[in-house]
């Protein structure tokens, strides 16, 4: 009987520890995203509409992410150039593309690899229906 109680107690402590460390890791990641200069950057000709963050609900929450929504009438390449220049000035690197409408960059942080995705095609939002450009922060697994 004593062995079963000890095993159960150990399992409960381990589960609680895993849950708490996972939650605190997401909180630290969210804090890093919010403090990154790109999270509050503005650019002439690119209007910021608002942002949304991933929810930590449920037993297995999605990867930590934050998306900023914009509208712009600038040519696509000029929009990319303005945002990517600011990103490079703030420690982002390893730029690559995924088709003509998506750019990626990454940087290493104390919580792992963080990535930004600049896009005209990803993530549409009912809350910001006029958005035609997004900047998404996410952590690589």
Task: Label every PLM stretch briefly.
Residues 2-6, 13-141:
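An acidic-aromatic pocket/loop used at catalytic or ligand-binding sites
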